[in-house]
Amino acid sequence: MEEVISASLADIMLAMNGEKFFVENWKVEVTPAALTVVNTSEVPVQDPRCTIITLPFSVWSAMECMLCRFQPANQLHVACKLFDTTFILQNQDLDQSRYVVVETVVSDLKKPISFSLVSEGRALAEGELRLVLTPLRALDYVHVFSVIYNMHNELPPGLELASVTEYCGSLVKELCGTAIRTRANTYTMAFKWEGARQFYRVTNSYFCEQYNRFKIVRLCVKECKMYRKEGNVHVLDITVVGDTQPEMVHGVVSVMGAEVDSMLVTDRYISPLYNQAWGWALPLYAPTQVVVPPKKTLKVPVDGMFFRGTVPGAQPVCLIGGSNINPDLVVRPVVWKPMTSLVLTLYNNSERPLAIRRGDLAALAVPVNSTDIRTVYSDNSGTLITWDTGTCEPVEQEEEEEARA
């Protein structure tokens, strides 16, 4: 029992290699690198362009089925085994042409797994639909930082320097002071940072009323940009989400300079999106409000880019895909490379217009390493994965034909 408790998820999957379990009309088989999922009955295809299929289980419940072979699988056991793990869903057979499973980042581990299927329009026979559910670890977040820009503008009127507290033995500096709302959904703080680094990361934040420190203002930080002025003065622009946004709030924000070599540097700090087991991805938000018509595609440019870090030989890329949080919004999977712009191809798989507001989640970016083989990538634990090997062209071609008609 002690060996099982201390074993990692990879160890357990290796020990269970070849074992199978069934959930309704689906067979799940354990392999050392992934779970394969195969249909045991015919799968109807409702729409030849794109069909949403929902499996009768989640990643979490599948892990519970695996772990219960060794010990009672309570929530803590599952969370410990899945710690720092993100899951992706793909085709198992990449050389088949009858259907394409749109590669998806499974960001909600407790929600039944949903995916989009592009096919020829007829039902898939027993054993024909073969999926692979792969656990991977994104690049170590401790090596992900954001750049600091130079600033030549004046500080906003009335903005005072926040106090900076350093704790013994910690690299984190705590900023405590007034944050002024300078535009919609954006607050600005200023502070002095002696010996600041080239890169930084925000590690924590909370806000309360300016004159009542016991009343919390529920603002969630989405993005930050930091600027350096003369005299070691730094300015932090904080993009937030919250129903109540006073003109001024009292902010407590913890920042950390890059004391270790960076592998990936973003042009702004983006609060990572964690799943229930602390696997992480970078959320990509819609830069403006768009409406995707039913059964249509729309291309949406994404603000920003990222860069290679200072680690010698670092070759980071980001796997871009949709989330299982909103299955109606289908995102074409692509690989985002350093110092390039990104345009998302979004498809509305519902019968009604799909409104995406400015700041809504549009896609997820999972940072991994590139390899010498095209379309093959390596996660933080050395697992080799592929991405963007299929195509959603059947969807786009159908829409173009309708538009010409």
Curated annotation (Swiss-Prot):
Pfam families: Herpes_ORF11. This is Uncharacterized gene 10 protein. SUPFAM superfamilies: dUTPase-like. It comes from Equine herpesvirus 2 (strain 86/87) (EHV-2). The gene is 10. It comes from the Viruses.
